[in-house]
Amino acid sequence: MTTATLLGAEPWSHIGRGSSGVLLIHGFTGSPSSMRGVAQACALAGFHVELPRLSGHGTTVADLVPARWSDWSADAETAYQTLRQRCDRIVVIGLSMGGALTLWLATHHPEIAGIVCINPVAQPLPDEMMSGLESLLRDGVESIPAIGSDIADPSAKEISYDATPVCALHSLFADGVNNFVKSYPSMTVPML
């Protein structure tokens, strides 16, 4: 199921000057809206910019239910390769799950000039929490309430979902973070 992208949740791209670019990756249940201000600042500074909308995000919660780590990592890889066609030097900036995807890209692309991880999902989920997710899946629970925004400014709005699909959350850890965390010691990409 694919529905229309929510207004403000669209991917964003900018052709800059020179040979440097920035890839920005939003977080789980969020949308490109959470990173658009940073993307626009990078564009104003003259950088090439890619800000993709990850699979299942920025539409409806139902679209996120079937999405998995393999979809999001493919989205990040595609955006990286798109930017790579225009740039020699790329910095990747990720928020939350976008931070996990940033770390994943860095483990696969040592040529990345640098990474910035903002509140990254960077550690495996403890066994008891993974067991809890697996129990919810066995019981047929499709989604749980969203964590909610932690933005201090009450007038600031982020386009995100009001529920968290359990299967997608499980995939973030079981198929993603839990598998590449062992690569951290061998990473050579500079990180802020």
Q: Could you describe each region identified by the protein language model?
A:
Residues 3-60:
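Short, surface-exposed "cap/lid" segments of acyl-processing enzymes
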Residues 13-16, 30, 160-192:
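Serine-hydrolase catalytic core
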Residues 60-86, 91:
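Catalytic nucleophile-loop/oxyanion-hole region of alpha/beta-hydrolase
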Residues 94-98, 102:
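Gly/Ala-rich beta-loop-alpha elbow adjacent to hydrolase catalytic centers
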Residues 104-108:
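Active-site signature of alpha/beta-hydrolase-fold catalytic machinery across serine-
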Residues 116-126:
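Active-site nucleophile loop of the alpha/beta-hydrolase fold
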Residues 131-147:
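A catalytic-pocket lid/entrance helix-loop region that shapes and gates access to the active site
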